[in-house]
């Protein structure tokens, strides 16, 4: 009878994972993991909503793995972790897809097509990939609640968003204004400032820059006699904006000059003079004179506009003072187009430029002669209907015709692009609704100090600095598919009125409700919400109507509202939300410090005066092997589903969680997924093999493992050691994932947790199991053998629970296979508790001896490798010379035996002193000695050369022999370097410090040579077993063909040992040329001077 399943050592992990997925689904393990935990002990994390109009990529998978690992961990720590999945439905991604598929482009086309039909298409297409998303999420082993998830386009969600806007308005944090903002002419909408900072939105752009003459229109005193015309030189990288130039700016803290060339004076900054002189030299121009011009004399100087379109504007076309003008930027004089530059707009507004005598609801009218698609309007006759980027050459041509052109150069500069269409943005004056973030900034900075960021530097670095420079947030978009800006205003400015609504039905006393004024509301989307109109109550004529402003809200406003909108707060779940906010945990990639994390922070501060989350992991980015962004166009990454099939989802998960990408670094992923393959080989398979090893031998011996509840009677030092190391692993994972100290925030260092698991797996497989194989192989069922089984079974019990959040599939398979039936799933079990391991601390000294033994072995193996002495070749002796290490001197014989067995050496001697095997070289720190005792440096050098010194207990060094001249130097004023005197010796480093020297005897006797040959034969038999596909306990029939006398003798001497170690039922020697009958049934492998033929024994059939 087998107590455990037959576990193969090299399984198809994807098949195992699919079986586990079926088990989870059929047994509803996820649902049970939530429902069995008390609501009184909830752990809240926010699942940021992805757009569902495309398939998941590795960035989504990485985020999902981190979320799932933390959620599983916290569940096993006793918390109730609800995991609602959300969908981001509104905004440009959906609209751009609809435009492409419907063949419409731009607002005019959409309005002609029909807003209702356009939005209906967006509604249906946005959820197109939800099934594929679900398949990806489930296949990666992530548990989420799809059935009770939220969608930002749902009426309940949108009502909460409407309430949030109303609350901010009510608190005086929302206003409407005209500002110059980043504008996507491809999407025909303004963008927020943080959208230009995300996803590497800046690209290198080659533009034509132009230097232009602005001719003065009045006489000025600083112009010398004989000069017929005077012009100011200004430089710009956007020549198309010159058609709406309204002013020039200088910096009065800079120096300016006038250069006379012929009958013309050209004015520019002193810093531009060298560039100007080189220009004159290239063009054979003679600069006759350069005069200094006080900057203040340039202020208010009038000039003639380069283009006539707005020449009648009042207060315009003069020189202004501006601090933003910088030395080294062009000519030191900036042309101002207030419709296309933020600084230009603010400076011109300050000076009343242009003053058209028109004010509308407190907003300054600005000449901005382009339409929504970035084309010039009829106000600019020569360029009407042309796109701003298409008129550059024509503008330069006209400047030349007017005699205003001075120079054209190619300019490569970093330029913002639309995050959705990858087209270059423009800056455009436009009307928008703003959240007044500047009012909240100081409070946000304070609240940020209460958040635990991973990595820690984000708090004061990327996020902290972003908060320091926070600007008011443009939250309205001139688009169609989104939550409406809930503002209605009078259509007649003679009877102004503005209403802001915060609910559909009248539920909250201080919140204006739509149905109070408009009747039943079925849909909050356009065009239905636009059709809600009513007479203006403040118009006694009854003619004006209250109409909604046509904008929709930025989709970032919606995702930033998800903590409460997913619950339909405050209309439902108010008590629950109030008691479970802020979230305990959140994670996304690091650029969300300027995106989702930021909008969550703004809205949470504005609405609740609280930070929105307590702990935040900012993970890095997955790139291709060249460091490029993963791209369908470049085809530079492997399909995630193929990686799951090839290596298993656990391997992909652990690759990401254990890498620096989980704490903000970047992961380079090659086309074949080699980094994932390496994880499978170095982490997943070793853990699996420890499980496989147990089941194979336990079934063979008919042994049933028992969890050790008590450590009484555990006498084997290997058992003591691995139990202690298991406890250390659990403690390290707990410390990495959370602090046990009251009031200390959770660090959530998943990478450290994974490192602890990897380190323990290495010790379990490469030290404990390998070192204890003989205990499992012995025929008799001794107490020691039973102890080995119970110890390994206990370790696997704790290991399965510890790795469950990080390797959920194989953890579950191990749990079910070893019949740990305390819970029907490892994910329903409790995470190991450090307190339950308190008894193993009695084995700490044991572990120190064992680590020292491992370090000694490592150095012996390094020496062997350096001298090409294979490990299978036994050596006669090794000698250890301790240095300041009592543990080496008094190491018990059991540990010495382990060393000998591990490194294949017959005897180990431990000397009492280093003797002649090595010596110390004294190196003095003359810089420190010269500062402290300059008068004694010569004496110290003399004493040091004598070579008599002694290290004192406090670490200082006593120079000189007793009874003679002596001197003490401090421990930081010298160092002792150990120098070995034999090429077959080396230092022993343990715990990072030298603890002695070891020497190996490399002389080989005939007996040693023959044993080495026998071990070489054994290795090739083991390789033949593997090639033949034999399982661990399968017996083999072996034939060795050779005429080599030494090989024959070695086989004869070590015959029984070879059979036992290789599980060979028969072992037969034949001459080299002997014919092997029925050769096809054998696997053949050749060594030097011999061939091995191996097949599975008939005993195994």
UniProtKB/Swiss-Prot annotation:
InterPro entries: aa-tRNA-synth_I_CS, aa-tRNA-synth_Ia, Anticodon_Ile_ABEc, Ile-tRNA-ligase, Ile-tRNA-ligase_type2, M/V/L/I-tRNA-synth_anticd-bd, Rossmann-like_a/b/a_fold, tRNAsynth_Ia_anticodon-bd. It is an enzyme of class 6 (ligase). Its main location: cytoplasm. A motif ('HIGH' region) lies at residues 50-60. One of its GO terms (cellular component) is cytoplasm. Catalyzes the attachment of isoleucine to tRNA(Ile). As IleRS can inadvertently accommodate and process structurally similar amino acids such as valine, to avoid such errors it has two additional distinct tRNA(Ile)-dependent editing activities. One activity is designated as 'pretransfer' editing and involves the hydrolysis of activated Val-AMP. The other activity is designated 'posttransfer' editing and involves deacylation of mischarged Val-tRNA(Ile). Its EC number is 6.1.1.5. It comes from Anaplasma marginale (strain St. Maries). Monomer. ATP binds at residue 632. Belongs to the class-I aminoacyl-tRNA synthetase family. IleS type 2 subfamily. SUPFAM superfamilies: Anticodon-binding domain of a subclass of class I aminoacyl-tRNA synthetases, Nucleotidylyl transferase, ValRS/IleRS/LeuRS editing domain. NCBIfam families: ileS. One of its GO terms (molecular function) is tRNA binding. Its cofactor is Zn(2+). It is found in: Cytoplasm. This is Isoleucine--tRNA ligase.
């Amino acid at each position: 009878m087998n107590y455990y399943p037959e576990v193969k050592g090299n399984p198809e992990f994807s098949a195992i994972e699919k079986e586990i997925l079926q088990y989870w689904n059929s047994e509803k393990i996820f649902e049970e993991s939530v429902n069995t935990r008390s609501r009184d002990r909830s752990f809240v994390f926010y699942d940021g909503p992805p757009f569902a109009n495309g398939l998941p990529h590795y960035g989504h998978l990485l985020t999902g793995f981190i979320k799932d690992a933390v959620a599983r961990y916290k569940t096993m720590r006793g918390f109730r972790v609800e995991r609602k999945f959300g969908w981001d439905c509104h905004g440009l991604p959906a609209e751009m897809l609809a435009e492409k598929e419907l063949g419409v482009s731009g607002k005019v086309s959409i309005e002609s097509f029909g807003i209702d039909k356009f939005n209906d298409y967006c509604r249906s297409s946005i959820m197109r990939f939800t099934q594929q998303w679900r398949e990806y999420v489930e296949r990666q082993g992530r548990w989420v609640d799809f059935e009770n998830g939220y969608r930002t386009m749902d009426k309940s969600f949108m009502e909460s968003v409407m309430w949030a806007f109303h609350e901010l308005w009510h608190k005086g944090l929302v206003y409407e204004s005209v500002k110059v903002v980043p504008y996507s002419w491809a999407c025909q909408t303004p963008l927020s400032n943080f959208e230009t900072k995300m996803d590497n939105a800046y690209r290198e752009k080659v533009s034509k820059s132009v230097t232009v003459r602005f001719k003065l229109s009045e006489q000025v005193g600083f112009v010398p006699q004989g000069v017929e015309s005077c012009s100011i030189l200004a430089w710009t990288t956007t020549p198309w904006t010159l058609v709406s130039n309204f002013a020039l700016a200088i910096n009065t803290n800079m120096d300016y000059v006038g250069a006379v060339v012929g009958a013309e004076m050209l004015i520019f900054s002193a810093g531009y003079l060298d560039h100007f002189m080189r220009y004159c030299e290239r063009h054979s121009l003679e600069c006759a004179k350069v005069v200094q011009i006080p900057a203040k004399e340039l202020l208010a100087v009038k000039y003639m506009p380069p283009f006539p379109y707005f020449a009648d504007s009042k207060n315009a076309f003069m020189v202004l003072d501006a601090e933003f003008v910088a030395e080294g930027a062009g000519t030191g004089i900036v042309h101002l187009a207030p419709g296309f530059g933020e600084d230009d707009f603010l400076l011109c507004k300050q000076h009343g430029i242009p003053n058209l005598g028109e004010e509308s609801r407190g907003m300054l009218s600005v000449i901005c002669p382009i339409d929504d698609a970035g084309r010039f309007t009829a106000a600019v006759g020569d360029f009407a209907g042309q796109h701003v980027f298409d008129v550059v050459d024509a503008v330069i041509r006209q400047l030349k015709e007017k005699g205003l052109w001075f120079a054209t150069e190619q300019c490569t500069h970093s330029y913002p692009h639309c995050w959705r269409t990858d087209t270059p943005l423009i800056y455009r004056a436009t009307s928008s609704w703003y959240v007044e973030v500047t009012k909240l900034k100081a409070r946000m900075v304070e609240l940020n100090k209460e958040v635990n960021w991973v990595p820690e530097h984000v708090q004061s670095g990327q996020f902290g600095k972003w908060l320091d420079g926070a600007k008011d947030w443009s939250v309205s978009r001139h688009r169609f598919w989104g939550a409406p800006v809930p503002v209605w205003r009078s259509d007649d400015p003679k009877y102004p009125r503005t209403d802001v609504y915060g609910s559909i039905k009248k539920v909250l006393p201080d919140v204006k409700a739509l149905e109070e004024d408009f009747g039943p509301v079925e849909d909050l989307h356009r065009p239905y919400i636009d059709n809600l109109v009513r007479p203006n109550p403040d118009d006694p004529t009854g003619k004006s109507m209250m109409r909604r402003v046509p904008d929709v809200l930025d989709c970032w406003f919606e995702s930033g509202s998800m903590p409460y909108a997913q619950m339909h707060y405050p209309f439902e779940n108010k008590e629950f939300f109030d008691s479970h906010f802020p979230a305990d945990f959140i994670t996304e990639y690091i650029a969300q410090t300027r995106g989702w994390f930021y909008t969550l922070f703004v809205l949470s501060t504005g609405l609740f005066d609280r930070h929105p989350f307590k702990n935040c992991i900012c993970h890095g980015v997955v790139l291709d092997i060249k460091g490029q962004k993963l791209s369908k166009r470049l085809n530079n990454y492997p399909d995630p589903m193929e990686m799951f099939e090839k290596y298993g989802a656990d391997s992909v998960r652990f690759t990401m969680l254990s890498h620096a990408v989980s704490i903000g670094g970047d992961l380079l992923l090659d086309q074949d997924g080699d980094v994932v393959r390496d994880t499978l080989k170095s982490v997943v398979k070793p853990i699996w093999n420890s499980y496989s090893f147990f089941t194979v031998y336990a079934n063979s011996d008919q042994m049933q493992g028992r969890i050790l509840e008590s450590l009484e009677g555990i006498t084997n030092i290997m058992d003591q050691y691995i139990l202690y190391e298991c406890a250390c692993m659990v403690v390290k994972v707990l410390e990495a994932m959370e602090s046990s100290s009251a009031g200390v925030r959770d660090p959530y260092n998943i990478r450290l947790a994974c490192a602890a698991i990897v380190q323990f797996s290495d010790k379990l497989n490469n030290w404990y199991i390998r070192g204890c194989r003989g205990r499992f192989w012995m025929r008799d069922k001794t107490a020691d053998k039973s102890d080995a089984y119970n110890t390994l079974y206990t370790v696997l019990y704790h290991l399965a629970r510890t790795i469950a959040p990080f390797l959920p599939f194989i953890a579950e398979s191990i749990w079910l296979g070893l019949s740990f039936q305390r819970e029907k799933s490892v994910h329903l079990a409790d995470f190991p508790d450090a307190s339950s391991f308190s008894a193993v601390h009695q084995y700490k000294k044991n572990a120190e001896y064992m680590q020292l033994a491992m370090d000694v072995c490592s150095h012996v193996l390094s020496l062997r490798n350096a001298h090409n002495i294979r490990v299978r070749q036994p050596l006669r002796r090794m000698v250890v010379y301790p240095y300041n290490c009592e543990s080496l001197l008094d190491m018990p014989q059991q540990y010495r035996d382990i060393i000998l067995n591990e490194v294949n050496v017959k005897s180990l001697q431990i000397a009492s002193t280093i003797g002649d095997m090595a010596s110390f070289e004294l190196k003095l720190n003359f810089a420190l000695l010269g500062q402290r005792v300059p008068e004694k440096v010569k004496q110290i050098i003399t004493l040091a050369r004598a070579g008599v010194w002694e290290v004192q207990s406090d670490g200082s060094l006593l120079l000189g022999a007793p009874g003679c001249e002596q001197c003490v130097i401090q421990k930081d004023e010298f160092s002792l370097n150990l120098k070995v005197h034999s090429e077959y010796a080396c230092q022993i480093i343990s715990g990072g410090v030298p603890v002695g020297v070891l020497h190996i005897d490399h002389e080989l006797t005939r007996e040693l040579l023959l044993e080495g040959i026998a071990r070489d034969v054994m290795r090739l038999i083991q390789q033949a077993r593997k090639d033949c596909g034999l399982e661990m306990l399968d017996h083999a029939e072996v034939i060795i063909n050779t005429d080599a006398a030494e090989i024959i003798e070695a086989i004869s001497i070590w015959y029984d040992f070879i059979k036992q170690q290789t599980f060979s039922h028969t072992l037969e020697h034949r001459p080299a040329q002997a014919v092997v009958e029925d050769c096809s049934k054998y696997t053949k492998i050749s060594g030097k001077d011999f061939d091995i033929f191996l097949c599975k024994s008939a005993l195994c059939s």
